[in-house]
């Protein structure tokens, strides 16, 4: 039996009280995908939104993993230079100016 069968609603709703909500119901995030009300809590996955940018497919939102990792490493005083290799692989999306507003346009 499944532990959680949430369908397409999104598991971010399970932690919604730890995030400020946007008008569209998605969490408000810092530029590093961190909660603006619960320091140290990061969101990864298809519920990540920045302005009108939607990271709905795994190949889009996984480009944000290194951004989160760098933020965590930096906050712990750990070196994060090795994460730059992800940029070379096209897996480090910190410049959202290249993204359109549609789901698959980053």
Predicted regions and their residues:
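Flavin (primarily FAD) cofactor-binding/catalytic cores of flavoenzymes
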Residues: 1-92, 96-106
